[in-house]
């Protein structure tokens, strides 16, 4: 599933094609993805001008001068493509601009979603109401983690994947950050020493910043809007590297936590 860096890469890739552009036509090629498209999607967006593109957690937001906001989630296999042409088998939504750009939402597995809200999307979209802070914002710090982790027996990895604790983190980048901070993903959250919480915050910021700069990670389906791969996968410290050597010299192992693969080094992550 695309995580924060992939969605940020997508939003940045859409800006040159959508921001400041009038939406000349909006076309859906099926009635639904994970859930139905909004019935008034085309009516409310056609003729509107896109004023801003932004991101919250793993969602992208397309805002218009009508104070309508189209919120997209890429699901497991979704991506936007900007090369134009005719719709393909797995293209389910088309945005056409007055400048002639044709942007397709491509989603083979159809686990993505499109929502449309009026007014402030951060206040009016239900999925945003309980989200934790953005990990690259000033609101995310060691004190916040200390409060969230207090008396919690759940593994630290599970807590970091909880979108109510911190928004946008997923399996890949949590594995990477825990390795950088030298913290075992199996450790109960309450057991993480306070001295290590600042290191964990720094590691999360560093991993996400590097991943965004590299265009995210391509695991199976993800491509940026212009069709580029996400090159951060070449720099993974532990993710997907079972049996290889950690930079400390220890062996990277894979375990399963809550149905997800966890990669870490038993030598340096304690």
Curated annotation (Swiss-Prot):
DNA binds at residues 90, 109, 152. PANTHER family: FORMAMIDOPYRIMIDINE-DNA GLYCOSYLASE. It comes from the Bacteria. One of its GO terms (molecular function) is damaged DNA binding. NCBIfam families: fpg, PRK01103.1. The lineage of its organism: Bacteria, Pseudomonadati, Pseudomonadota, Alphaproteobacteria, Sphingomonadales. InterPro entries: DNA_glyclase/AP_lyase_DNA-bd (IPR015886), DNA_glyclase_Znf_dom_DNA_BS (IPR015887), Formamido-pyr_DNA_Glyclase (IPR020629), FPG_cat (IPR012319), MutM-like_N-ter (IPR035937), Ribosomal_uS13-like_H2TH (IPR010979), Znf_DNA_glyclase/AP_lyase (IPR000214), Znf_FPG/IleRS (IPR010663). Binds 1 zinc ion per subunit. This is Formamidopyrimidine-DNA glycosylase. The keyword Zinc-finger applies. Involved in base excision repair of DNA damaged by oxidation or by mutagenic agents. Acts as a DNA glycosylase that recognizes and removes damaged bases. Has a preference for oxidized purines, such as 7,8-dihydro-8-oxoguanine (8-oxoG). Has AP (apurinic/apyrimidinic) lyase activity and introduces nicks in the DNA strand. Cleaves the DNA backbone by beta-delta elimination to generate a single-strand break at the site of the removed base with both 3'- and 5'-phosphates. Pfam families: Fapy_DNA_glyco, H2TH, zf-FPG_IleRS. Its EC number is 3.2.2.23, 4.2.99.18. A zinc finger (FPG-type) spans 237-270.
